[in-house]
Curated annotation (Swiss-Prot):
One of its GO terms (biological process) is humoral immune response. InterPro entries: Defensin_insect, Defensin_invertebrate/fungal, Scorpion_toxin-like, Scorpion_toxin-like_sf. It comes from Trypoxylus dichotomus (Japanese rhinoceros beetle). This is Defensin. It is found in: Secreted. Induction: By bacterial infection.
Length: 43
């Protein structure tokens, strides 16, 4: 959801990746990133 919700990039900074990482941290994971529009959390 977070990857498609705010998928924009400004000066090389992708806000959707930050939101995905924050989502993953909130559920107890070690961060994450977007891959093909899907938020993938690290284990």
């Amino acid at each position: 959801v977070t990857c498609d919700l705010l998928s924009f990039e400004a000066k090389g900074f992708a806000a959707n990746h930050s939101l995905c990482a924050a989502h993953c941290l909130a559920i107890g994971r070690r961060g994450g990133s977007c891959e093909r529009g899907v938020c993938i959390c690290r284990r």
